[in-house]
Amino acid sequence: MCPFCFYFCMQIILKTVMEDKKSLAGAWVEAARPRTLPASVSPVLLGCALAYYDGMFDITPAVLCLLVALFAQIASNFANDYFDFKKGADREDRLGPERAVAQGWITPKAMLAGTFVMLGLACLSGLLLICFADWRLIWVGLAIAICVLAYSAGPFPLAYNGLGDVCVLLFYGVIPVCFTYYIQTLSFSLLSFLLSVALSLIHISE
């Protein structure tokens, strides 16, 4: 599925479920921020396209890479919702998209639990990828898991200390493109790196 098709499908789901914004299912869908998910899907698809071009595409690890990206993105969105509320950055009268915890749709405790559920699913999907590549992928997974939380949490949240663009460069470009390609081909390529940087720059400029 191309990123544009994915985006429009998520828009339809969002509009359908969120007709009643007070419904619990609708609140969780809104908290997942479907509009942001194509940013996670597109680098994985690019890595898969490069593997396919080289005749090495493998559907099973490709799907697992996609699940890692989606679960990690949703976990990051949930964490951002929770920690921004705790810091007072998100209030009920904030400008921009409404946030589930600030609006009272989801309790802080439930949002934190949801964060770790999504992060756990991302880690599980990542562990399964070791069967197709190398145990050292654990270090990549650990870096992803740490940054999911560190982006918004801790004494030095990356998003609020000038490192947001660096995170986008790494986690919406270089890492998902290059490692999706690597897991299927067991090699790195200069082309995958250059295209990953180009894609991340597009995300940064949005």
Residue ranges with predicted function:
Residues D81, K86, F193-A198:
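Hydrophobic, small-residue-rich transmembrane alpha-helices and their short perimembrane loops
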Residues V68-D81:
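Hydrophobic alpha-helical membrane-embedded segments
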Residues L37-V41, I59-L67, L112-F116, I138-L142, ...:
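Hydrophobic alpha-helical transmembrane segments
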Residues T16-A25, Y82-I106, S205:
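Cytosolic, membrane-interface loops and tails of multi-pass inner-membrane proteins
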Residues P97-S187:
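Intramembrane alpha-helical segments
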Residues Q11-L64, V68, P155-F156:
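Topogenic membrane-insertion module of multi-pass membrane proteins
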Residues C2-C5, C9:
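Cysteine-centered motifs
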Residues S200-E206:
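Residue-level detector of conserved catalytic or cofactor/ligand-binding positions
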